[in-house]
Amino acid sequence: MAKRTKKVGITGKYGVRYGSSLRRQVKKLEIQQHARYDCSFCGKKTVKRGAAGIWTCSCCKKTVAGGAYTVSTAAAATVRSTIRRLREMVEA
């Protein structure tokens, strides 16, 4: 089957509606949310989005809470590093 879109990709379903800049933003989000991610438990690239913020590994069947469009957010990474730093300060 021939490739039908070059620029618009997944947002071709919206046609000419909503404006190009909004469709460009939505394209970025929809590519992220439909992508497969690496599982932090089994290491395979099998994590998919089940609902907003719910990510499930189809291999090991683990369910993880994450961001709405990606498994890990920048805020979550900051919190993890802060918790790790505070834990090291308490132990030392």
Curated annotation (Swiss-Prot):
ZnF C4-type: positions: 39-60
Task of the protein: Component of the ribosome, a large ribonucleoprotein complex responsible for the synthesis of proteins in the cell. The small ribosomal subunit (SSU) binds messenger RNAs (mRNAs) and translates the encoded message by selecting cognate aminoacyl-transfer RNA (tRNA) molecules. The large subunit (LSU) contains the ribosomal catalytic site termed the peptidyl transferase center (PTC), which catalyzes the formation of peptide bonds, thereby polymerizing the amino acids delivered by tRNAs into a polypeptide chain.
GO cellular component, one term: cytosolic large ribosomal subunit
One GO process term, biological-process aspect: cytoplasmic translation
Quaternary organization: Component of the large ribosomal subunit (LSU). Mature yeast ribosomes consist of a small (40S) and a large (60S) subunit. The 40S small subunit contains 1 molecule of ribosomal RNA (18S rRNA) and 33 different proteins (encoded by 57 genes). The large 60S subunit contains 3 rRNA molecules (25S, 5.8S and 5S rRNA) and 46 different proteins (encoded by 81 genes).
Compartments, record wording: Cytoplasm
Alphabetical list of Pfam families matching this protein: Ribosomal_L37ae (PF01780)
Positions of post-translational Phosphoserine modification: S40
Name of the protein described by the UniProt record: Large ribosomal subunit protein eL43A
Main location (coarse class): cytoplasm
Lineage, broadest ranks: Eukaryota, Fungi, Dikarya, Ascomycota, Saccharomycotina
